[in-house]
Amino acid sequence: MTGKIFLDGGAGYIGSMLIGYLLDEGYKVTCFDNLLYDKTSLLAYCSHKNFNFIKGDVRNFELLKKEISKHDIIIPFSALVGAPLCEKNPLDAKLVNFEHVKYLAKNKSKDQLLLYNNSNSGLGETDGKSLATEETEFNPISLYGKTKYFGELAVRESENHLVFRLATIFGGSPRPRNDLLVNNLVLRALKDRVLIVYEGHYIRNYLHIRDVCKAFVFALDNWDKCKNEVYNLGNDNLNMSKLDLCKKINEYIPVEIIEAQYTKDLDKRNYKISSQKFYNKGFQCEYSLDDGIKELMQVYKMIDVPQYANY
């Protein structure tokens, strides 16, 4: 498949990586972003003949409507990501995470493709033993989890859609994020040689950012057999506790690991995820946790650490 893609929030952590994959596949990509966090993450694409940038805010619905009408595929990435940031900015969380997505879903044509990313954060707290599938009841706790889930529900009411529920993402990007769990723990290990972990028994599922990008391309290339469904998107080999994650990092960076209940996860994320439904379509993950740790060890030799976080 080729076509014109409208990707909002494309200057962010995943979007700035995904754009390169889409351009390599021959898509024409318009990135719509207000550049809240980073004004340089897209510079490498500016010379590409199929790349276009529009500086704009997704809360400007009239501008959104005008721009999406020119495209075949809509991929909304603009979001206030993470429970802490949404708690600080509840109105913007509702407008950006939910209302703008609902507007896109209602105002696109039936022939336009809409590819949405939700988060598995909405699962809330499970027993951490049984595998959560797409049929497992969603129970979002935080404002972040709720707004992302409401966005998913709006998308599912439209024709020609696909929803991914993303695992915890890790790895380097043109717009790095140091507040993601794996990235942050590698950074802390390198800087402090100590990892202080709370709720260490809590289990999460992880996925390398490049596998996220590959999954989006795969979905577009195989749209007819994938469309109008919800898919967990994670690495089934990476269901692991936070404490085991620290131990894996310790294999590469010698650290002292300390368990301390100094805070709590607002989303109470404790779950094992199965992404078998999407694997059954033919997708395979390529990047391991070891790959990501070694990559991040190189990344953190280069970047200005305090600059790259969402909250």
Regions found by a protein language model. Give the residues of each.
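Conserved Rossmann-fold NAD(P)-dependent oxidoreductase catalytic core, especially the SDR/UDP-sugar
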Residues: P76, K102-I141
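N-terminal Rossmann/SDR dinucleotide-binding element
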Residues: M1-I73
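Active-site Tyr-X1-5-Lys
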Residues: N139-L162, L190
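NAD(P)H-binding glycine-rich loop region in Rossmannoid oxidoreductase-like domains
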Residues: V58-L95
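C-terminal substrate-binding subdomain of Rossmann-fold SDR/epimerase-dehydratase oxidoreductases
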Residues: D192-R193, V197-Y311
